[in-house]
Design a protein with these regions (language model features):
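Acidic, metal-coordinating helix/loop segments flanking the phosphotransfer/catalytic sites
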Residues: 43-65
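Acidic catalytic/metal-coordinating carboxylates
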Residues: 46, 66, 74-79
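Two-component/phosphorelay signaling modules centered on CheY-like receiver
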Residues: 23-42
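Non-catalytic signal-transmission and effector/linker regions of two-component phosphorelay proteins
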Residues: 1-15, 60, 103, 110, ...
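Hydrophobic/aromatic residues positioned on beta-strands within the core alpha/beta folds
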Residues: 92-95
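Short amphipathic alpha-helix used as the core "switch/output" element in two-component signaling
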Residues: 75-89
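Conserved acidic carboxylate
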Residues: 20
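Active-site residues of response regulator receiver
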Residues: 69
Length: 135
């Protein structure tokens, strides 16, 4: 996938965790983030996978931001969100559930609705990663 001129290298040097159980959606997210210069951590397709990646990444360069699908094959992503919040890693939720989603106590976190505009997703990740003190 060619990099859009609107977001070329905006995420250079940033490590972004992708937690998404739908393979095609995950590949789209990963491609856009890489096109924007990010190093993608993951993807994780389950809560357990994501928690392992967070633990490993915390000692291997950190995580600048994360994209979390709210529902991972019936499991709520809240434990991952809680762990990221405890580490001061900013994240956003991606959901296809419209207004009927549970953010598990993280009401101030940005929510990107599926199907999402990839430019909006990258811009939101960029804002999170650049505001983060953990680069």
């Amino acid at each position: 996938m060619d990099a859009s001129p609107n977001h070329v290298a905006r995420l250079t040097g940033k490590r972004v965790l992708v937690v998404e159980d739908e393979a095609l959606v995950s590949m789209l997210i990963e491609d856009e983030l890489r096109d924007a210069g990010a190093e993608v951590v993951g993807p994780a397709i389950s809560v357990d996978d994501a928690l392992r990646l967070v633990e490993t990444a915390a000692t291997a360069g950190g995580i600048s931001a994360a994209v979390l699908d709210i529902n991972l094959d019936g499991q709520h992503v809240a434990p991952v969100a809680d762990q990221l919040a405890a580490l001061n890693v900013p994240f956003l939720f991606a959901t296809g559930y419209g207004a009927n989603y549970d953010v598990g106590g993280h009401g101030a976190v940005p929510v990107v609705q599926k199907p999402f505009d990839l430019e909006q997703l990258v811009a939101t990740v960029e804002a999170l990663a650049c505001a983060s003190t953990r680069r």
